[in-house]
């Protein structure tokens, strides 16, 4: 069973927890009824798209679409998708990424763990996560106490993708 909360953006999570418990259970059942992990992850993305449309959430649909493309990656688009994803949540030239996209990083880690090790998808995801390990996490708005904890959690998520391992 997939715990979906780490894979949800903060905006979606905020709206999700306001739903009645029966609606939350419906979404979780819909996600978990899929037999394959990849299908479950696709359903998590579909749920987020639904919430983005319903609550008019900005910025996230682009990241969600890129994650869906990474699930279905082919050889011609691997590098371009990796660059597009890095640019969507950070800046490759500055070596930074925004902590508000912790959910997207957690999603990629989950997807990597459920990919064949030598597949194009696994190789592309490993490259993205390896880059992020060496990037500096930044906040979109003023720093707050929670972001220090979030930065540490992200570093722990990314540690297996560092070159030293």
Segments from the language model and where they lie:
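Charge-dense, helix-prone N-terminal extensions
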Residues: 1-61
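Long, helix-rich interaction regions
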Residues: 59, 133-165
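N-terminal "cap/leader" segments of large eukaryotic alpha-helical scaffolds
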Residues: 59-79
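Boundary/linker elements of alpha-helical solenoid repeat scaffolds
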Residues: 62-67, 85-96, 137-142, 152-155
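Alpha-solenoid HEAT/Armadillo-like helical repeat scaffolds in large eukaryotic proteins
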Residues: 66-73, 110-112, 157-161
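HEAT-repeat alpha-solenoid elements in large eukaryotic scaffold proteins
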Residues: 75-89
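Conserved hydrophobic register position within alpha-solenoid helical repeats
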Residues: 81-85, 121-125, 154, 165
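Residue-level signature of the C-terminal ends
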Residues: 88-92, 111, 131-135, 161
